């Protein structure tokens, strides 16, 4: 549980740093930075134990934030809409391990969502682990996360 608290602190710090950019609302680069940092922290937490695990969380958060910010800055509104629609479809009905693809015909950006393990959280909601892979300008980037199904049927990212 302590590790989860540390990850939440990192995510909160990232969101406060984003708030300092002076814009009302979060821009696409800020959103990418925040989500990339949280995903990187989660991935980094899988390595090591004790202080080594904390270092993994910090390094993962930093690298995830940098990569997420780059992805967010490069994705346009259509890319984000296609990714969101594909994510909802993949999480709702795709078998674990399958790649559900999207492509923006206007700019060539594309990617896929891979849903993985399905589980129930402590509140009884169905949740899934997933990987999002995007190819922007020929460069591939991956993010990892978890999403839970809401009462209205939509899937919401929980980390």
Swiss-Prot record:
Keyword Cytoplasm annotated: no
Record flagged with keyword Lipoprotein: yes
Family from the record: Belongs to the rickettsiale 17 kDa surface antigen family.
Lipid attachment site numbers (S-diacylglycerol cysteine): 20
Keywords in alphabetical order: Cell outer membrane, Lipoprotein, Membrane, Palmitate, Signal
Signal sequence annotation: 1-19
GO cellular component: cell outer membrane
Topological category with respect to the lipid bilayer: Lipid-anchor
Main location (coarse class): membrane
One Pfam family per UniProt: 17kDa_Anti_2
Subcellular location: Cell outer membrane
Superkingdom of origin organism: Bacteria
Full protein name: 17 kDa surface antigen
Encoding gene (name): omp
Native species: Rickettsia prowazekii (strain Madrid E)
Lipid attachment residues per UniProt (N-palmitoyl cysteine): 20
InterPro entries xref list: Anti_2, Gly_zipper_2TM_dom, Surface_antigen_Rickettsia
